[in-house]
Amino acid sequence: MGLLDARISNRNVLVTSVDNVMNWARLSSLWPMGFGLACCAIEMMATNASNYDLERFGIFPRSSPRQSDLMIVAGTVTMKMAERVVTLYEQMPEPRYVLSMGSCSNSGGPYWHHGYHVLKGVDRIIPVDVYVPGCPPRPEALIGGLMKIQELIRMEGLGISRQDALKKLAGKRVDPQQVIDQVRKSATA
């Protein structure tokens, strides 16, 4: 028995709920999959560099949707790319989260009015949990969005649904399934 064992043996009981343990584990090990489509992808890559050290937050980027629990959509989503975004989203295991990064991903950006080929926001095809504004947003803004995702995870639990947690964080959302169906119909027409 060493000196360390004596200190630990006095405090070896932790009282908490299963929700708190599960949420702590999930928010402390986010595995985002970056889906970089335009200028915002450069800022997303800069955020993953050593200057910002996302690993201190427990964030480890992954390249496969099957190993990710967070999808970062960064950049302009075109109508042709929309179906692939949905496919990647559906390949992610539950619970899964989506962060929309940049004006183009949030609302169509500068292509909103005249761009017939640009999706007017990724939330029309998949449910978005956190929006990061900017054109392109700075790495600090993306880190702020990631911290919002962690806050959302902390609020979720066995008794609280994601919908209730999202209502606490933000306003109402668009029903994504209806828009997915509309995009698929327009793509086949």
Curated annotation (Swiss-Prot):
Cellular component terms (Gene Ontology): plasma membrane; respiratory chain complex I
Q: Where in the cell is it found?
A: Cell inner membrane
The enzyme's first-digit EC class, named in words, is: translocase
Q: What is its EC number?
A: 7.1.1.-
For this protein, the record's Gene3D superfamilies field holds:
3.40.50.12280
What the protein does comes down to:
NDH-1 shuttles electrons from NADH, via FMN and iron-sulfur (Fe-S) centers, to quinones in the respiratory chain. The immediate electron acceptor for the enzyme in this species is believed to be a menaquinone. Couples the redox reaction to proton translocation (for every two electrons transferred, four hydrogen ions are translocated across the cytoplasmic membrane), and thus conserves the redox energy in a proton gradient.
**What's the name of the protein?**
NADH-quinone oxidoreductase subunit B
